[in-house]
Amino acid sequence: MNQHDPLHTCKSCQNEFTGTFCNHCGEKILTPSDKSFKTILNNIILAFTLVDSRFVKTLWMVIKSPGALSRDFSNGKRVMQLSPTALFFVLNLIYFFFPVIQLFNASLNTQLMSPLRGFYSDLIAHKVVNMGVDLNSFTLLYNLKTTSLAKLMVMVFVVVSSLPLNFLYWKKNKYFMDHIGYAVELACFNLFINIIVLTMIMRLVGGGGYLDETALTVIFIVTNLYFVLRSSHTFYHEKGWRLLVKSITLILFLKVALEVYRAILFFITMASL
């Protein structure tokens, strides 16, 4: 250490030190250059660079080896990749800020194709009269509101979809939070494959007009069957005919969970208008 180095007082812990960083808490001396736009931009790029390798590695693990992330996280192997929850919030952030295919979102037209459409129609008619607007105006207001709410409520789907896991795999000695972690990984898979990637493909080929509710349901079933078959073997150690039967059963539960989530979204949207 140079004896001519100036003595600084740490802004965080009041420790006196020389150099750039506090030797007690690690706080950095703030200089005018640290407040420049260039430095701020460099710090943002650096932050993304440091996270990027783990993010890409974790995302690739979810796609290539479904269930491995949940297994490693449950077993305490957590340093080399992001946690399922951290990955979920990164993907949900992308989902929140960009216009994408509505899987977790559901327009008024989509809601009116649900098994509860008769009940929904009566509520909508009553709401339209109370608001004093026509159906077209109400549809516009509803769709704007439900889009923003849906992007905040994806975790509701995670919780709902985790409930059947406790029933299907109760002999596997898994904790409730293990099932939640698995459901979060499943949500990450759907956010990336069935929303982000599918949106990019449709934008490139211009086939968005063909993606009606039936097409989305088929894609949802096929992609999730791939995930569930692979992940149930990896995470729950299922195999043979039990793996197939439980995977198909879980797909049915996931479709029900999606409808339950959309029903919750409908009632919250209606209440907020």
Q: What are these language model-derived features?
A:
Residues 1-273:
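Membrane-proximal intrinsically disordered regions of secretory-pathway and membrane-system proteins
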